């Protein structure tokens, strides 16, 4: 495997909370995929703060992923096309759907993600890998 790209993002939890409040909850529905949305509602029902922290980590993960694959938030990378879920062990992993999944498969791209939150910040880091041969390093003459 070769590294296709890396991406990182940091989100301010209080800003995510403010947007969520201002939109009456629609922000979560716009950003989260169906499985993420179920987890968000369950966590928020137990603790408002943990629900918002979850939303912030998922927002951050999507931003980091979009950077790692080099598209930013442009087709086929859409908010709901990528979900960050957790294995029973707690380890996060990404799941792509629709045209994004097709785009990634055509390029042999897989990704690893890590997320963390502490008080007012959520941070994510993504390493996108490909099974394609690595590109040669560009050299300049001296």
UniProtKB/Swiss-Prot annotation:
Signal peptide: none annotated. Gene3D superfamilies: 4'-phosphopantetheinyl transferase domain (3.90.470.20). It catalyses: apo-[ACP] + CoA = holo-[ACP] + adenosine 3',5'-bisphosphate + H(+). It holds the Pfam family ACPS. GO terms for cellular component: cytoplasm. It comes from the Bacteria. It is found in: Cytoplasm. Keywords: Cytoplasm, Fatty acid biosynthesis, Fatty acid metabolism, Lipid biosynthesis, Lipid metabolism, Magnesium, Metal-binding, Transferase. SUPFAM superfamilies: 4'-phosphopantetheinyl transferase. One of its GO terms (biological process) is fatty acid biosynthetic process. GO terms for molecular function: holo-[acyl-carrier-protein] synthase activity; magnesium ion binding. The keyword Lipid biosynthesis applies. Its EC number is 2.7.8.7. Its cofactor is Mg(2+). The keyword Metal-binding applies. Mg(2+) binds at residues 9, 63. Belongs to the P-Pant transferase superfamily. AcpS family. Transfers the 4'-phosphopantetheine moiety from coenzyme A to a Ser of acyl-carrier-protein. HAMAP family: AcpS. This is Holo-[acyl-carrier-protein] synthase.
